[in-house]
């Protein structure tokens, strides 16, 4: 009960420092990123003599600029340096606007460190590695983490997944000081995420998630799902949360999200990296899934909020983007503006805004994922726009508690999470679903039934399979596939053998494979489709559907296969 009170209150509401040689003072003009927006200027604050392969940035309550140096992200055999990531305090000791000294704030068993953030009230420094959130303190303000107050495993991701930048990242804090963070798709590997007081949640293959916990990591809860990799997460005053989604696969653009509690943003790794499977939605195409707020440049990393606008670092497109937010009653609209565009080696990763109005931006420099010995921190001025008003916290109430009697809850996808929760238990009655004449409303009632009873003890998913609307049939198949509902196998196999449409054939053969414990990522499911197409006893309808949804025919069908199809005389084929 205590954790729920904390959570819904949110919804409503040591190493030795060493000096280094001074950094070079000159920066070749042709290598500097170019300001695009009026009034913006940028200069290099620190170069690779002070920072290499930087990821996260943060400014402490005392004004110290902390920067993460990665020494572990695809480390080559000949890389020189310590075998742990390092957090440096970067200083401008002579006040000329260019950093000239660094010292070690913390370095001890840091692997694939992605982010660093300062708690708004306590001043504690939170660090996100791929698998762990650590809390550090500097109570005596000496620029070195207090060795007796290092809190490891505030949150821990227990998994065999080890790709460096699709685990924990995106640290931020809500208005009450609670912790919010992202976890990437983890390449679909099984995981258990462990919070304070031994809270454990396990899953696999569902894609990236955004999580909420109290400041000490306790009361861990999933806040939203359906991301690829919410690498950057930011909280704006009033309880509004935004995130970057780092990778669009074959469905560009990358996504910028307004993150709503309980929202499903459509992606699931188990159905393939391409993002083309009918069970995947990228922009709210399926009922119950959330549309993106806007597209971003490729490989968006950190996100920062200031004065009613969002700032995004696009690593691959080498630019800093700004998005002014306009409230429309149930969410936001926005347009993209380019502030800074890089030429050549400019790969922005993370931001930190200082009290003097400067924006610091870490720069990985090269496109290489392997460590390469280069790095920079840039200082941007003139970047903050005039204040754009944000709505009060009360404006989010319709996003949390629905009124099903209002039509807007049935038509605006951003209100779907609240509606699905509100319908809840009532829609476990199959009669209520059948009685709904509007197909879209019927689909949302089906999703409410799933939310109330995921294991489908009432057998409602098979009622969805028998519906006349293809979207409802698709949602029923997805429910069965996601949860691997064995009791629905016969009904799913019947649809495979008599598919209403090619799209539903693909969905049904995927669900059948999932029930049988098979993997269904892109090439695996394509192989199953090819096998059905070659079956001589398969009906014309099945073979025609299989042929239409077989994406890589040249890889799955030989010349002999095509000749047999042609010589069969089957007019449907």
Give the role of each language-model region.
Residues 406-411, 431-437, 448, 460-468, ...:
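Alpha-solenoid HEAT/Armadillo-like helical repeat scaffolds in large eukaryotic proteins
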Residues 19-403:
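Beta-propeller domains with acidic blade repeats across secreted/periplasmic ectodomains
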Residues 457-458, 489, 522-526, 559:
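Core helices of alpha-solenoid repeat scaffolds
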Residues 392-402, 413-426, 440-455, 459-463, ...:
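Structural detector for internal amphipathic alpha-helices that build alpha-solenoid repeat scaffolds
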Residues 43, 88, 103, 208-211, ...:
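Solvent-exposed, polar/charged alpha-helical surfaces in well-ordered, non-transmembrane soluble domains
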Residues 5-15:
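Bacterial N-terminal signal peptides
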Residues 354, 358, 408-413, 417:
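Gly/Ser/Thr/Pro-enriched helix-cap/hinge segments flanking short amphipathic alpha-helices
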């Amino acid at each position: 009960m205590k954790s729920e009170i904390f959570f819904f209150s949110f919804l409503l509401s040591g190493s030795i420092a060493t000096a280094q040689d001074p950094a070079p003072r000159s920066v070749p003009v042709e290598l500097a990123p170019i300001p695009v927006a009026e009034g913006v200027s940028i200069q290099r604050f620190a170069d690779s003599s002070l920072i290499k392969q930087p990821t996260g940035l943060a400014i402490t309550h005392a004004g110290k600029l902390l920067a993460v140096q990665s020494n572990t992200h695809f480390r080559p055999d000949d890389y020189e340096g310590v075998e742990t990531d390092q957090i440096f305090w970067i200083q401008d000791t002579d006040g000329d606007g260019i950093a000239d000294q660094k010292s070690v704030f913390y370095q001890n068993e840091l692997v694939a460190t992605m982010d660093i953030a300062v708690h708004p009230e306590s001043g504690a420094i939170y660090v996100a590695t791929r698998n762990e959130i650590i809390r550090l303190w500097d109570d005596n303000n000496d620029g070195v983490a207090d060795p007796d107050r290092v809190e490891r495993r505030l949150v821990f991701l227990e998994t065999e997944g080890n790709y460096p930048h699709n685990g924990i990242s995106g640290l931020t804090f809500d208005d009450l000081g609670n912790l919010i963070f992202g976890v990437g798709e983890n390449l679909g590997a099984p995981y258990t995420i462990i919070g304070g007081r031994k809270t454990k949640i396990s899953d696999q293959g569902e894609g990236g998630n955004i999580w909420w916990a109290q400041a000490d990591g306790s009361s861990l809860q999933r806040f939203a799902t359906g991301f690829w990799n919410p690498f950057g997460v930011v909280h704006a005053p009033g309880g509004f949360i935004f995130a970057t989604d780092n990778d669009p696969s074959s469905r560009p653009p990358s996504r910028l999200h307004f993150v709503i509690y309980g929202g499903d943003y459509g992606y699931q790794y188990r159905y393939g990296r391409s993002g083309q499977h009918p069970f995947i939605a990228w922009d709210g195409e399926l009922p119950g899934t959330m549309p993106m707020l806007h597209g971003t440049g490729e490989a968006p990393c950190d996100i920062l909020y200031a004065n009613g606008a969002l700032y995004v670092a696009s690593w691959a497109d080498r630019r800093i983007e700004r998005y002014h937010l306009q409230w429309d009653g149930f969410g936001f609209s926005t347009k993209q503006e380019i502030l800074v565009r890089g030429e050549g080696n400019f790969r922005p990763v993370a931001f930190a805004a200082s009290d003097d109005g400067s924006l610091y931006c870490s720069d990985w420099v090269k496109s290489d994922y392997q460590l390469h010995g280069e790095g920079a921190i840039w200082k941007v001025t003139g970047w903050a726009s005039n204040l754009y008003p944000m709505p009060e916290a009360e404006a989010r109430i319709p996003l949390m508690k629905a009124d099903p009697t209002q039509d807007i809850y049935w038509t605006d996808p951003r209100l779907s999470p609240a509606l699905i929760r509100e319908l809840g238990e009532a829609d476990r009655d199959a009669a209520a679903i059948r009685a709904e004449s509007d197909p879209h409303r019927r689909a949302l009632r089906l999703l409410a039934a799933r939310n109330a009873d995921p294991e489908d003890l009432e057998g409602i998913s098979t009622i969805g399979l028998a519906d006349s609307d293809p979207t409802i049939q698709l949602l029923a198949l997805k429910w069965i596939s996601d949860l691997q509902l064995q009791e629905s196998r016969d009904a799913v196999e019947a649809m495979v053998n008599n598919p209403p449409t090619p799209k539903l054939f693909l969905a049904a053969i995927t669900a059948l494979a999932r029930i049988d414990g098979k993997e269904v990522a892109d090439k695996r499911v394509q192989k199953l489709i090819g096998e059905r197409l070659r079956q001589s006893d398969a009906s014309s309808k099945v073979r025609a559907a299989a042929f239409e949804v077989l994406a890589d025919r040249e890889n799955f069908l030989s010349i002999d296969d095509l000749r047999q199809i042609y010589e069969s005389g089957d007019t449907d084929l």
